[in-house]
C-alpha cells in the first residue's frame, strides 16, 4: 500500500486474533477400583489383590484411596478457558532499481490463557494441602507468551542471470512453559518464576540463496555449452536455550561461576562430544559447599543458557537439455554441508550433566546422516520435465 501515489516506499500492517485449542486429550481417565499393578499373582489368584469398591465421592471416601499407594489426581480447573493468540505485523518495502526489493518489518505475537500444568498439592505429605493424596495435577489456562522480531529481506530478480534472496531475523520468544502439558513449574504457586526464553527461541537467523544461469558459449555444441545453472543455499542461526543437567526438566540450580570458563567448544574425542559448559559452575541449592541462595529454585533462571549454533552451506549444479518443445532433461549434482561442519544438537536436553553435547543435530532429531547440517554428502539425479 502506498497512500501517497508516488515513489515513497509502500507500507503494510496487519493484525489478527486466533484461537489455539488445547487438543482432544486434555483429560486422562480415572479408575474407581484401586489395584496394584506391580503385584505378581500365583495361578488362580485374584489379579486385583485388596481391591475395594469406590462407591462414594473419590475425594472424601477412604476406600477410593487404595490400600498401599498414595493416590494421585489429575484435574482441570473449573475456570479453564480456550487459549488464544494475537498476531500483528508492519512492513516497509522499497524498490532498489528494477531488479531488487528491500523489505523491513516488525512481526510479533502475544499468547494468552495458555495451558499450564500445576501441582496444587505440592510440598510433600507433611506440608501438602491434602496430605492423604500425592500430586494433584491441575490443567490451568493461566500461561502467557510473546514473540517480537525484526525481519529484513533483500530479493534480487534476474540481474544478469542472478536471482537470489538474503534474509536476516532478530527475534526473541518468551513464555512460562513452551510445550502443551509440559513440565511442572518449580513452584506451582509462583508461575512468574518460570518466565524466560522459549524452548525454540532462536535469537539470530540468517539465510541466503542464489541461482545463477551461466551464459552460453558459441564454442562447441549448444547442448553442451548452454543450460548450466549454479545454485547455493546458506543457513546460519544461533543456538537454542537449555537448562543445565536437566534433560527436558528444569531442576533448581545455583550458578556460582563462569559457565564457559576453560571450555573450548571444540570437538573432543576423549569425551565423545563437544564440551559446552563447565559443570563446576553449577551446584544444587542447599547442598554442601554450594554458595548462593538456599531456595530450592536456585538463582539460575529457566532457559538461561544457549546451546551450539548452526551453519550449513549447500551447492548444486544443474544442466538443462531441451529434447523437445515440451520435454527437457535436467541433470542435477547436489552437495550438502560443503564445508563438512559439525552441527551439534541444541535446545532442551542437548547438553548432558558433564556439560558435553554428544549428538549431532540430525541424530538428536532422529534423522542421523540425513537431516540438515549432517556430514558432507552428495547426490546425483536425473529429472524429466514436461
Predicted regions and their residues:
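Core nucleotidyl-transferase/polymerase catalytic module
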Residues: 23-49, 56, 65
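Surface-exposed extracellular loop regions of Gram-negative outer-membrane beta-barrel proteins
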Residues: 1-33, 39, 112-120, 231-240
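Short, solvent-exposed micro-motifs at the edges of structured domains
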Residues: 45-386
Amino acid at each position: 500500500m502506498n497512500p501517497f501515489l508516488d515513489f515513497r516506499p509502500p507500507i503494510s500492517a496487519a493484525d489478527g486474533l486466533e484461537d489455539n485449542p488445547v487438543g482432544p486429550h486434555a483429560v486422562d481417565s480415572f479408575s474407581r477400583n484401586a489395584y496394584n499393578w506391580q503385584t505378581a499373582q500365583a495361578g488362580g489368584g485374584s489379579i486385583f489383590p485388596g481391591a475395594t469398591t469406590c462407591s462414594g465421592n473419590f475425594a472424601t471416601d477412604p476406600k477410593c484411596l487404595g490400600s498401599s499407594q498414595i493416590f494421585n489426581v489429575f484435574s482441570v480447573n473449573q475456570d479453564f478457558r480456550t487459549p488464544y493468540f494475537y498476531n500483528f505485523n508492519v512492513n516497509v518495502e522499497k524498490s532498489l532499481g528494477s531488479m531488487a526489493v528491500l523489505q523491513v518489518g516488525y512481526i510479533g505475537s502475544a499468547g494468552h490463557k495458555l495451558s499450564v500444568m500445576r501441582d496444587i498439592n505440592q510440598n510433600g505429605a507433611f506440608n501438602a494441602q491434602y496430605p492423604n493424596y500425592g500430586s494433584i495435577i491441575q490443567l490451568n489456562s493461566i500461561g502467557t507468551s510473546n514473540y517480537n522480531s525484526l525481519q529484513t529481506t533483500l530479493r534480487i530478480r534476474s540481474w544478469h542471470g542472478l536471482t537470489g534472496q538474503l534474509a536476516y531475523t532478530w527475534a526473541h520468544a518468551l513464555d512460562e512453559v513452551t510445550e502443551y502439558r509440559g513440565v511442572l513449574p518449580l513452584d506451582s504457586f509462583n508461575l512468574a518464576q518460570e518466565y524466560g526464553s522459549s524452548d525454540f527461541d532462536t535469537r539470530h537467523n540468517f539465510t541466503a540463496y542464489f541461482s545463477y544461469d551461466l551464459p552460453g558459449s558459441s564454442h562447441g555444441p549448444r547442448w553442451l555449452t548452454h543450460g548450466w545453472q549454479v545454485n547455493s543455499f546458506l543457513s546460519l542461526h544461533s543456538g537454542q536455550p537449555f537448562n543445565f543437567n536437566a534433560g527436558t526438566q528444569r531442576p533448581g540450580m545455583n550458578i556460582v561461576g563462569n559457565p564457559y570458563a576453560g571450555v573450548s567448544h571444540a570437538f573432543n574425542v576423549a569425551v565423545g562430544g563437544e564440551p559446552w559448559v563447565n559443570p563446576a559452575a553449577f551446584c544444587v541449592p542447599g547442598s554442601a559447599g554450594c554458595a548462593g541462595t538456599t531456595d530450592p529454585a536456585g538463582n539460575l533462571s529457566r532457559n538461561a543458557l544457549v546451546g551450539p549454533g548452526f551453519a550449513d552451506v549447500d551447492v548444486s549444479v544443474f544442466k538443462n537439455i531441451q529434447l523437445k518443445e515440451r520435454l527437457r532433461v535436467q541433470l542435477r549434482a547436489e552437495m550438502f554441508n560443503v564445508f563438512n561442519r559439525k552441527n551439534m544438537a541444541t535446545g532442551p536436553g542437548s547438553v548432558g550433566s558433564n556439560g558435553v553435547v554428544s549428538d549431532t543435530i540430525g541424530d538428536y532429531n532422529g534423522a542421523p546422516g540425513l537431516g540438515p547440517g549432517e556430514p558432507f554428502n552428495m547426490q546425483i539425479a536425473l529429472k524429466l520435465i514436461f
